[in-house]
Amino acid sequence: KYVQDNWKFKGVVADVSNLDSSNMQFETSGELITVKPDWIINTSCEHMDTNWFKSADNDQLIIMQSNNSSDFDGHINPCKDIEDFRIKYPLEKTHYVGQLVTPAYTRFMQIGYKK
């Protein structure tokens, strides 16, 4: 009821390293919200350590992307290839694994439930 109301969502700006994915608490518009999300979407794994992944429960669908480039500011945790990505973020039940080769880097994506 706090997060979704007729497809209206409250936006939150927070440091992901301070969030516990299995029991998120954050304040928005002066209201403390506690929620366990069904899905976790991280499209920039290369910008952070793996603690966000470790805090997720195995019943939360994880949709994540990373890349293999350390040539950009803030890329502190790139993966060298798709196999490195899968080892760093192991999934028990995988719905999708893929990569997209671009001129600047290769982008990796996984969707599934963690071990």
Predicted regions and their residues:
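C-terminal substrate-binding/active-site "lid" region of AdoMet-derived donor-dependent transferases
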Residues: D49-K114
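S-adenosyl-L-methionine
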Residues: Y2-T43
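Secondary-structure boundary elements
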Residues: D5, K114-K115
